C-alpha cells in the first residue's frame, strides 16, 4: 500500500500556494508507484499581485519536461485563469492553438512552457488538482473490464473517461463529466491515469493516496502469485551467474544497438524483473503494448524479449539470439514507422530501449546511463501494471497507430528538446588507468565535460573514488565510476573490464596512463628495478590494451586508445635506462596495435609528455629527488629547470595532456592512428623524426 508522506510540521512552513504545491508535488514524485518519472502534473489556484500591483487569480501548474520528484518553484508555470476559463466554451482547439494561447496567459515570460494537460487543471473548479499515473490505477484502467471493476471499488464516486490523447478535447471531456456527476471524487482515464482534487493541498494529497490504496487493496486481493504471468517457466539463475553472463554479452548487445548512434547500457535484475522474464506468458504479454502513454518516448511500444532457455554454458547461443533479436526488432520498428509516419517525422533510433532475458534480467539502453535508467524505471512500472491488469482480467494497450502518434507527438518531443545538446563524447565510455592521479583525473574531467562516462581505474581506490564523487556531484549520478585495479594482474584487468561491461555496456576510449618511474645509473640498475618498470609500463599497458582490443572487437563499433608515453620514449634519459626502455616499449606497442586495429576501426595513438609535476604521485615521491640529483640541482629547482630547457619556456600541466588525449579520442583525429604527439614545451632532443 502507498504510504502518506505528509509531514504537518514541514507543510506548515510552506506559506504560499506555490510553496505548498512544490511540497505536495515532491511527495507525489518521490514514490514511483504513484507517479512516473517525468510524468504526471499538479496545480494550485491562488491569488497573486500582478506587475501593476493588482490581485489576479492565477493557476500554477507543472512546467513541461520537469519531474515532480525534484521540482522547484522555478519549474512551475503561472497562468492567468481569467484568460483560460472561457476556453471551455469552445468546441475545438488544436494542440498548436492551445500552446500558443497558453503562452499568452503566462504571468511571467521566463516561466517554462505549461504542461500538456494544463487545461485539465484549469477547467476543474477545485483549488488543488493532481494528475498521476499510479500502478494500481493504471492496472485498473488497462484491464479489459476496468470500468465495470471500478464500479465495485468506487461505486458512483468516479468518472470514467474513454481514452483520448491529452489536450483540449480530453480536458473538456473530463470537466463536463465531473460537472454531470455531483458525487464525483476522482476521474479514471482509460489506459492513462488518475485525477483527484481537494480544497487544501493536504486534502488533495490525502485524496490521491486514499483513492490509490482502494484500488491497490482490490487488486492485491485477486493476485495469485503462483499463477502470475502464467506461472514460472524459467527460474532466475544465481546472482553471480547472472552477472557473469551479462558481463560477457553486454558488449555484443552494445554493438548491435549502436550501429547508427552509440548507446550506454545498464543492467537490472531486481526481483520483479526476474519474476516477469521467467513467466510462461511473458513473451506474449510483453508484446501487447505500452502500459501508459507516458512510457512510449523512453521505452518504445514493446521491449525485445529474447527466446532463450537460461543456461550458463550457452553464452554463445545467447549472443547469437541477441544479435538476431536486435536486427529483427529494428526491422519491425522501421515497418512500424513507415506504416504510421506523418509528414515531417524523422525516425528515432530503431534499436530497443528494453531487452528482457529469461533467468537473467533486463538490459536498458539510452544515449546516457541516466536515460537508460529512465527506460528501466518506466518498465518496472509497466511490469507492475501488467501484474495488476492480468490479475483483474486481460491487459489491453493502445493501438499501434495511437502508440506511434504519442511516441512522435510534437508536444512530447518538445520535452526531449529541453535536454542539453549532445557533445563530442556523448554516448561514449572512457576507461582511464591511473585515474586518481593528476593526468588521469584531469582527463576524466575533460572528457566528462563533453559528455563522456568515465571509469577511473587505480590501485589507489580511495583517490579514484574521490575524483569520481566530485564528477558525479557536478554532472550527475554514475557519470564516473571508480574501481581498484592492478595493471600487472591479468585477472584483475579482465575483471575490471567485465565490471565496466556490466556498468555501461562496454568502452570506446582507453587512456593507458598508469605509471611509475625509477632512476638509477645503468650499472646500478637492479633486475628488480628493471622488472618493476617493465611490469607496470610494459606488461601493464599490454594487458590493458589487449583486453580493451578484445572488447572493442566484440562490440564492432571501433574505438580509440591513447597511450601516455614520455619524452623518454624517444630520448635517452640520463640515469633512467629501465624507465626509458619501458616507455619506448609502450610507444612501439601502440604502433603495433594500431597496425592490427585499423580493420576494426580501432585507433591507437601516443602522447609523449615531459615533467608533469602537478598532481603527480610519481613526482611527489623519490623520483623528484632522483631526477634532481641526476641534473645536479635541488629538488625544488626542478620545475624551473624543466621550463628553461623547453624551446617555448613553459611548464606542462595535467590539463595540457588531457587536451591532447581529448584530441586523439575525438572525431577530430578520426583518420589518425599510430601517431606520436609530443606535449613537452619543445625539448629538441625529443623531437620525433
Located regions from the model:
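Short C-terminal tail/terminal secondary-structure segment
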Residues: 673-689
Amino acid at each position: 500500500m502507498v504510504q502518506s508522506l505528509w509531514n504537518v510540521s514541514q507543510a506548515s512552513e510552506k506559506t504560499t500556494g506555490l510553496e505548498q504545491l512544490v511540497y505536495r508535488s515532491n511527495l507525489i514524485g518521490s514514490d514511483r508507484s504513484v507517479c512516473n518519472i517525468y510524468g504526471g502534473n499538479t496545480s494550485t489556484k491562488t491569488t497573486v499581485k500582478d506587475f501593476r500591483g493588482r490581485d489576479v487569480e492565477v493557476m500554477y501548474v507543472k512546467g513541461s519536461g520537469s519531474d515532480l520528484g525534484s521540482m522547484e518553484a522555478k519549474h512551475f508555470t503561472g497562468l492567468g485563469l481569467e484568460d483560460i476559463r472561457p476556453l471551455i466554451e469552445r468546441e475545438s482547439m488544436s494542440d498548436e492553438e492551445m500552446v500558443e494561447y497558453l503562452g499568452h496567459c503566462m504571468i511571467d515570460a521566463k516561466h517554462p512552457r505549461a504542461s500538456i494537460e494544463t487545461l485539465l487543471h484549469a477547467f476543474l473548479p477545485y483549488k488543488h488538482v493532481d494528475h498521476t499515473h499510479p500502478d494500481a490505477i493504471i492496472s485498473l484502467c488497462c484491464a479489459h473490464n476496468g470500468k465495470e471493476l471500478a464500479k465495485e471499488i468506487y461505486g458512483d464516486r468516479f468518472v470514467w473517461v474513454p481514452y483520448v490523447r491529452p489536450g483540449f478535447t480530453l480536458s473538456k471531456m473530463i470537466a463536463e463529466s465531473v460537472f454531470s456527476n455531483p458525487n464525483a471524487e476522482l476521474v479514471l482515464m482509460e489506459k492513462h491515469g488518475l485525477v483527484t482534487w481537494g480544497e487544501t493541498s493536504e486534502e488533495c494529497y490525502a485524496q490521491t493516496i486514499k483513492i490509490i490504496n482502494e484500488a491497490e487493496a482490490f487488486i492485491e486481493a485477486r493476485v495469485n502469485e503462483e499463477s502470475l504471468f502464467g506461472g514460472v517457466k524459467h527460474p532466475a539463475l544465481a546472482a553471480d551467474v547472472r552477472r557473469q553472463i551479462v558481463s560477457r554479452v553486454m558488449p555484443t548487445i552494445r554493438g548491435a544497438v549502436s550501429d547508427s548512434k552509440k548507446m550506454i547500457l545498464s543492467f537490472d535484475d531486481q526481483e520483479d524483473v526476474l519474476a516477469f522474464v521467467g513467466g510462461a506468458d511473458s513473451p506474449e504479454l510483453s508484446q501487447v503494448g505500452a502500459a501508459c502513454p507516458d512510457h512510449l518516448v523512453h521505452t518504445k511500444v514493446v521491449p525485445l524479449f529474447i527466446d532463450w532457455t537460461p543456461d550458463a554454458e550457452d553464452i554463445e547461443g545467447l549472443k547469437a539470439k541477441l544479435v538476431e533479436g536486435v536486427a529483427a526488432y529494428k526491422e519491425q520498428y522501421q515497418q512500424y514507422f513507415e506504416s504510421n509516419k506523418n509528414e515531417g517525422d524523422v525516425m528515432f533510433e530503431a534499436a530497443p530501449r528494453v531487452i528482457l532475458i529469461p533467468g537473467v534480467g533486463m538490459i536498458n539502453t539510452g544515449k546516457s546511463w541516466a536515460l537508460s535508467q529512465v527506460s528501466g524505471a518506466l518498465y518496472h512500472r509497466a511490469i507492475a501494471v501488467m501484474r495488476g491488469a492480468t490479475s483483474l482480467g486481460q491487459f489491453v494497450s493502445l493501438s499501434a497507430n495511437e502508440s506511434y502518434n504519442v511516441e512522435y507527438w510534437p508536444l512530447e518531443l518538445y520535452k526531449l528538446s529541453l535536454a542539453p545538446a549532445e557533445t563530442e563524447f556523448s554516448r561514449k565510455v572512457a576507461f582511464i588507468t591511473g585515474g586518481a592521479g593528476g593526468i588521469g583525473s584531469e582527463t576524466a574531467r575533460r572528457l566528462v565535460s563533453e559528455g563522456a562516462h568515465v571509469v577511473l581505474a587505480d590501485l589507489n581506490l580511495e583517490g579514484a573514488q574521490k575524483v569520481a564523487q566530485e564528477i558525479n556531484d557536478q554532472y550527475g549520478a554514475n557519470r564516473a565510476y571508480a574501481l581498484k585495479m592492478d595493471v600487472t594482474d591479468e585477472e584483475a584487468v579482465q575483471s575490471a573490464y567485465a565490471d565496466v561491461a556490466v556498468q555501461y555496456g562496454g568502452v570506446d576510449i582507453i587512456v593507458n596512463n598508469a605509471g611509475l618511474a625509477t632512476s638509477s645509473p645503468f650499472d646500478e640498475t637492479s633486475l628488480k628495478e628493471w622488472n618493476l618498470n617493465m611490469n607496470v609500463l610494459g606488461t601493464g599497458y599490454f594487458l590493458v590494451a589487449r583486453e580493451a582490443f578484445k572488447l572493442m572487437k566484440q562490440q564492432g563499433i571501433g574505438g580509440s586508445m591513447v597511450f601516455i608515453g614520455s619524452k623518454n620514449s624517444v630520448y635517452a634519459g640520463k640515469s633512467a635506462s629501465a624507465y626509458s626502455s619501458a616507455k619506448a616499449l609502450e610507444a612501439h606497442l601502440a604502433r603495433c596495435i594500431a597496425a592490427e586495429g585499423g580493420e576494426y576501426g580501432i585507433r591507437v595513438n601516443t602522447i609523449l609528455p615531459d615533467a608533469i609535476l602537478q598532481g603527480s604521485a610519481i613526482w611527489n615521491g623519490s623520483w623528484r629527488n632522483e631526477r634532481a640529483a641526476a641534473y645536479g640541482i635541488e629538488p625544488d629547482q626542478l620545475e624551473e629547470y624543466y621550463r628553461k630547457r623547453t624551446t617555448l619556456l613553459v611548464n606542462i600541466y595535467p590539463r595540457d595532456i588531457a587536451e591532447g588525449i581529448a584530441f586523439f579520442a575525438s572525431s577530430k583525429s578520426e583518420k589518425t592512428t599510430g601517431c606520436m604527439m609530443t606535449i613537452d614545451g619543445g625539448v629538441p632532443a625529443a623531437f620525433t623524426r
